[in-house]
Regions:
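Helix-loop-helix
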Residues: 1-52, 98, 196-197, 217-222, ...
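Intrinsically disordered/low-complexity terminal segments and short unstructured peptides
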Residues: 23, 50-56, 75-77, 156, ...
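Juxtamembrane extramembrane loops of integral membrane proteins
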Residues: 2-4, 33-128, 171, 586-592
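Soluble non-transmembrane domains of integral membrane proteins
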Residues: 86-355
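Selective for proline/serine-rich intrinsically disordered segments
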Residues: 31, 60-62, 67-73, 134, ...
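Aromatic/His-enriched, Gly/Pro-containing loop or helix-boundary segments
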Residues: 10-15, 52-54, 60, 79, ...
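Compositionally biased regions
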Residues: 57-61, 66, 153, 159, ...
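General helical secondary-structure elements
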Residues: 11-12, 63, 178, 246
Length: 592
């Protein structure tokens, strides 16, 4: 049976303590006879009066014990503040409010970003969750009683009032058996340095800095559900990580069970949401561990009616990261998932590749297309038109025009298929009497294939433009989902291109209906199938896009409108007129 090891103590500490007590006891026993042998003789008896005075004095004083140490131990040094007070540290990017109760953060405001309601600066500390489960930069220990003492103690601070970065603030606390020191260093970036050390009953214990309970930017149940814990270890056995060296492992809520300890190495780790992150950057990735935290919280069902009694249960995530076997010295990034900022934030790495935080921006499997699209969109915004909505319009126009040759190729392919449609039907009628298992049925496919080759027709040619456009659509979806720049970006009547806009979604549905009506249908298409493509497909796509980001609907609706103009022009060309005449002939034959 393995021996239980207290995680707060180093291995063997209990045995060493027992050995110290045993040696002390032996020294006291051996020292007592020596005191009797070498002590001076007793003084001769004095007069009665003097004896009475001496006896009186002796009665009032404590009688020394032979086993009492010659020098008493020094009194316990305590460091405790008399009252709670706040210390504010700020630079051009943030304003952090510390409380000396727990030496933890009560408010963390990002000055350059608005909250979701767009009525004030962004507050990252979720007050409801923090009051229940702990504030940022409090300390995690495996002993809940010690953890509660660490977060409720009144620390002595090295500074007071409001400080401007660069600055350093130290919090200290000591009582009979607990000694704590927390030091925070601030500069002009989103990164701060965190140093912590905790001793309990004379032994150093593990106490990890933590961000315990979600972000203040989370307001709706959906935003809470978007919370994750991201980490990068660069030494993972995950199959995907082996293929992609900079692959980031992401723990969604359903994969997190509170209190689990994950062993490192960790180059960085911490809770994130769609646009912001609070990740710890250990100074020694090899020695780092992470404790995952998950708790439940009751929030208003409708964030716009916080006074309502209707609530819903959500899950909040957090993480504690650091060294389990001693003091901690690490950095922490708390800020936006903005690619340029993350790439400028250095990280100690194990393999010296991608030594920054760029992995926090999750482009997903379509990153090969999504990231260049995003960088192109940013360039358009900064160099051509200083509005994100119009930048999307310009980019969509260029993409759609670039796909014009494919659309022309699609029309040519459809025309060729219409020309040979009677011959294909004749071949099919020829082999109609044979069953599918009859070997002669294969001859039908061979004849049709030979006909395609002779006429230069490609039955899949009509689908090519759609197949080419599909990756761009998915990449746009991924890009707009993580593009911090589009958060609260305005365009015409739209206040936030990253949020749904139902007017634009309806416009997208109408544009798809128009597109289906003016696009020539392939030869031989069943009328019921044609009707479904004309009506059901736009409605189905509208249902999907109705609650997606307005920026994505803008891209798709504009792409449809440009395609409508292209198709209207192409319908007037010789190729278009020929396709229309053939379609009219097919219609007249069906009427007969």
């Amino acid at each position: 049976m393995p021996e239980y090891q207290n995680p707060h103590q180093e291995p063997g500490s209990e045995r060493r303590l027992l050995l110290v007590f045993l040696l002390t006891f032996l020294v006291l026993i051996a020292f007592e006879p020596l005191l009797k042998k070498f002590s001076p003789p007793s003084p001769p008896p004095e007069k009665h009066a003097a004896t009475e005075q001496t006896a009186s004095t002796s009665a009032s004083a404590p009688v020394p014990s032979a086993r009492q140490p010659a020098v008493p131990p020094p009194p316990t040094v305590t460091k405790q503040a008399s009252s709670e007070r706040e210390i504010v540290v700020e630079n051009s990017l943030y304003r952090i409010t510390f409380s000396n109760r727990g030496a933890q953060v009560k408010s963390w405001i990002l000055k350059k970003f608005d909250n979701d309601a767009q009525n004030g600066p962004l507050e990252l500390v979720n007050s409801a969750a923090a009051q229940k489960y702990g504030y940022p930069l409090s300390l995690w220990t495996y002993d809940e009683a010690v953890r509660n003492r660490l977060s409720s103690a009144l620390y002595v601070t090295s500074s007071e009032g409001t400080l401007s970065a660069p600055a350093t603030v130290t919090f200290e606390y000591a009582d009979q058996d607990l000694s704590v020191r927390k030091t925070f260093h601030f500069d002009h970036s989103y990164v701060l340095r965190v140093e912590t050390s905790v001793a309990y009953k004379g032994s150093e214990i593990s106490a990890l800095p933590m961000w315990p309970s979600g972000f203040g930017d989370q307001a709706t149940p959906a935003s809470f559900a978007a919370g994750r814990i991201d980490y990068h270890d660069n030494d993972s056995t995950d199959k995907t990580a082996l293929v992609f060296p900079n692959y980031v492992l992401r723990l969604a809520i359903k994969k997190v069970s509170g209190g689990d300890t994950l062993k490192g190495p960790f180059e960085w780790a911490g809770p994130v949401d769609q646009y912001f992150a609070a990740v710890f950057i250990p100074g020694d990735p090899e020695a780092a561990s992470m404790v995952t935290l998950r708790n439940s919280l009751e929030v208003p069902r409708d964030p716009e009616k916080p006074e309502s009694k209707e609530t819903t249960k959500v899950e909040v995530l957090g993480a504690a990261v650091g060294n389990l076997h001693g003091p901690n010295d690490e950095r922490m990034y708390v800020g936006p998932k903005e690619l340029s900022v993350l790439e400028a934030t250095p990280v100690p790495t194990i393999k010296n590749d991608h030594p920054d935080l760029r992995g926090l921006v999750d482009f997903g499997w379509w990153g090969l297309i999504a990231k260049p699209l995003f960088l192109w969109l940013r360039w358009t915004y900064f160099h051509i038109v200083p509005n994100w909505g119009w930048a999307i319009v310009v980019q969509t126009l260029i993409i759609t025009l670039a796909l014009l040759p494919l659309r022309i190729s699609q029309m040519k392919s459809m025309l060729k298929m219409q020309r040979i449609a009677p011959q294909i039907k004749s071949i099919q009628e020829k082999y109609k009497k044979y069953s599918l298992r009859d070997p002669r049925k294969a001859a039908m496919n061979e004849e049709i294939t030979a006909l395609y080759k002779k006429e230069g027709a490609n039955p899949a040619g009509g689908c090519l433009p759609m197949l080419i456009q599909f990756p761009f659509l998915i990449a746009y979806y991924r890009m707009l989902g993580i593009a911090l720049d589009l958060r609260h970006a305005h365009w015409l009547w739209i206040r936030d291109l990253s949020a749904p806009d139902h007017i634009l979604a309806i416009g997208m549905i109408v544009s798809m209906l128009l597109m289906q009506r003016i696009t020539p249908q392939p030869a031989g298409m069943d009328p019921a199938q044609q009707k479904m493509m004309t009506w059901m497909m736009p409605l189905f796509m509208g249902f999907i896009f109705f609650n997606l980001a307005a920026g994505l609907n803008l891209y798709y609706a504009e792409s449809n409108l440009i395609s409508i103009v292209q198709q209207a022009i192409m319908n007037r060309t010789k190729l278009g007129r020929e396709m229309r005449e053939m379609a009219e002939k097919r219609a007249r034959k069906k009427d007969k």
